[in-house]
């Protein structure tokens, strides 16, 4: 089962259930509106596996090369839950831990492995896992402290930019965010057609969103 096994024993109080609904609505709205991200398939607040809710996205076709525009929109989508919680409730929760881990890993790869940082430039360094498995086990880090600091700064910059774009997206579409969340509280699960109907759009993202995807990290 793609969405995992339903965890029927989990009973959330009304406040937590509303928070989960807005968290998943943030992901779903970003998936529906970011033109380069994987499109929305389904969103649910039924606890499954280790998750209290889930937003499923599916690529329209197999992807073997990841473009920078795609990665940047995916980061916005990943941060959608955390940003939605902050906008609605005025603070974030621990529920975004996995989202943050995945977003940080993606931003790190963009800078360290894929040459997608203008400041760091067209350079690549293997991950620690690759070093440990390879012949350079005792070699250690192969770049300077200054470069290490620059890499950290660029990773943070990419994530901060994604967070800012996500805040702009959700604030400008606050009515849609509320509509998705309230519908989830009633129906618990929505497919992509239902979400797009709540947002008043077709499956293709609205025109005018290009400015949200054009800023460089």
Residue ranges and their predicted role:
Residues 1-5, 24-27:
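Short intrinsically disordered, low-complexity coil segments enriched in acidic
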Residues 2-14:
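P-loop NTPase nucleotide-binding/switch module
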Residues 11, 15-22, 28-217:
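Soluble catalytic regions of large protease machineries
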